[in-house]
Amino acid sequence: MPPKKGGDGLKPPPIIGRFGTSLKIGIVGLPNVGKSTFFNVLTNSQASAENFPFCTIDPNESRVPVPDERFDFLCQCHKPASKIPAFLNVVDIAGLVKGAHNGQGLGNAFLSHISACDGIFHLTRAFEDDDITHVEGSVDPIRDIEIIHEELQLKDEEMIGPIIDKLEKVAVRGGDKKLKPEYDIMCKVKSWVIDQKKPVRFYHDWNDKEIEVLNKHLLLTSKPMVYLVNLSEKDYIRKKNKWLIKIKEWVDKSDPGALVIPFSGALELKLQELSAEERQKYLEANMTQSALPKIIKAGFAALQLEYFFTAGPDEVRAWTIRKGTKAPQAAGKIHTDFEKGFIMAEVMKYDDFKDEGSENAVKAAGKYRQQGRNYIVEDGDIIFFKFNTPQQSKKK
């Protein structure tokens, strides 16, 4: 089947946030809610997890492989010499406290660390433990969530004022017509964030030009959030905690569409210390499972990332792209020559490959597609790119 001509891909929606695939998600919360323990079990690292505020001062950064049964299946089929999954970049940020936007605690330094991230794991504590102090004196995850939201909101309000003042000076009083649209857009942002007291991400009708301006300033409330609720081991196993319903109701009302994922840092730490066989027995005996795979996948998706596969006996690899990436740009992730000389993308859907059992069987079933440069790559596509070089045509 020849590659489809122009128009074989819809225009992808604009995305608020930094452009690229090396994006980071930061673990944010009050001190002593379990952030460093979570970071340790997530990344198998040993960041300090002491029982006092601000034990994490410089953010710890690591990357974790994204678990995917599709990747595992392709590796089983091809038995490749090299296996490279997709990765999620995770940053452990020190605990925020009330008044951080005014410099309380380690204040502005922490907020700048959040600014350097592209998404947020908002971790809150819903377990009681007399040995672990709470910076606010009691366990109340709703209050804690609201403190974090307020600090991010107030920091954005603090940032917006000087931006508008500068634009007004140049675009309005100075008559710079090129900057007038940006000034108008920032006034709209001010109305939403400051006057209506709403985060940037809650407004779903930003147009392309507005998103372009938002991406220039990268406000904290524009960053997507995944809410992680740290439970005791007992509560996690029995799937019961007095705060869970209240947290879900708060998020549904205040951050509609955001995910709430319960987990237990204590359980995950215990599982990590067991052998693989002991871990499996423990999980089966307690009829439970680790929440980490779900959390990693949720963080990856929150950053608007996905991946396609290249697969063969030499290598099975997941190539990370932003949602909405077209075939030539996806090819460029492998090598710039692939994008410059792009001819077509030969695409198999993962489910078709799994159902049919081989590439030849997919072709025989008429499910092997040749796509042109307007094709928008879909998550899990298995792709072979054809491209031209000055010397010859090649295929990978």
Curated annotation (Swiss-Prot):
GO terms for biological process: ATP metabolic process. Its cofactor is Mg(2+). One of its GO terms (molecular function) is ATP hydrolysis activity. InterPro entries: ATPase_YchF/OLA1, Beta-grasp_dom_sf, G_OBG, GTP-bd, P-loop_NTPase, TGS, TGS-like, TGS-like_dom_sf. The modification N6-acetyllysine is found at K294. It is found in: Cytoplasm; Nucleus; Nucleus, Nucleolus. Keywords: Acetylation, ATP-binding, Cytoplasm, Hydrolase, Magnesium, Metal-binding, Nucleotide-binding, Nucleus. PANTHER family: OBG GTPASE FAMILY (PTHR23305), OBG-LIKE ATPASE 1 (PTHR23305:SF11). Hydrolyzes ATP, and can also hydrolyze GTP with lower efficiency. Has lower affinity for GTP. This is Obg-like ATPase 1. It comes from Rattus norvegicus (Rat). The gene is Ola1.
